[in-house]
Amino acid sequence: MAGSPLDALRDLPLADRAVALSWLGQAGFALRTGGTGGTGGAGGTTALIDPFLSPWDGRLYESALPAARAEGVDLVLVTHEHIDHFDAASAPAIAAASPEAVFVVPAPIVGMVAESGIAPDRVVGVQPGDDIELAGLRIRPVPAMHGVTMADAYGFGRELSGGLVRFLGFVLDAGGVRVYHAGDTIHFDGMEATLRDLEVDVGLLPINGRDPEREARGIVGNLSEREAAWLAREVAFDLLIPMHYDLFARNRGYPSHVVDSVDRDHPGVPVFVPPREHPFELGARR
């Protein structure tokens, strides 16, 4: 059997303070830090972020990472409960393949994650303002503005969750690189100030946007290509990596439009569009 994206990630030579990423499609990423520690056999910490690995009607391609082969994973980070971010069907198989893995999720969905078959003591609920370290990875949750359905969009989900924030992004100190995974979000007041204060180096931003036609079909939208380029400039990311644009035919975005927007309106913003499931290294920035 051919190697999985996690195998390729672990095989990539990595400096002590560098980080390697592999885009799994949609909002899914695998991440490995350099150095020692972790359970994956290659040193450092291995994390999955929003892994959507199950077959699903309407997917334009299948995942190249079977959940049962998600071995050596230390952390699974989940930004919110939508199927393409929290894949309840594959979560138990990931947990079985990586028995040391801890699931880090928004506090309002801890019960949902446990009910999928994850032992409760392996599920950590978090909120914006928390600052935790697990498996050598510093994790700082930040709010995301989204919705479970269009009926509650666009907000932070507090009204559904007893005042708690239901939709998150994560700022990760991965070696010498500070990475922001936005989850699903649109722009909101204070967003760029929060990210500037956290001194984010690399932004993983959704770019599929939103419009009345998709919203009428119940699709809660995200940043557009132009908005992602603008945010990257406002925060002064060292690198913008577009995501969440290619898995469903009726909810697409186009990274070429991000590049066009940068070229036209925000020169100087570096953009990298990674191929799926091919690991790449980011050197230390701090």
Residue ranges and their predicted role:
Residues P5-L9, L14, A30-A96, V148-G157, ...:
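Pre-active-site segment of Zn-dependent metallo-hydrolases
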Residues D87-A97, M112-I118, R250-D260:
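Metal-dependent catalytic neighborhoods of phosphoester/phosphodiester hydrolases
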Residues V102-V104, P108, I186-R276:
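Cap/insert and terminal regions of metallo-dependent hydrolase folds
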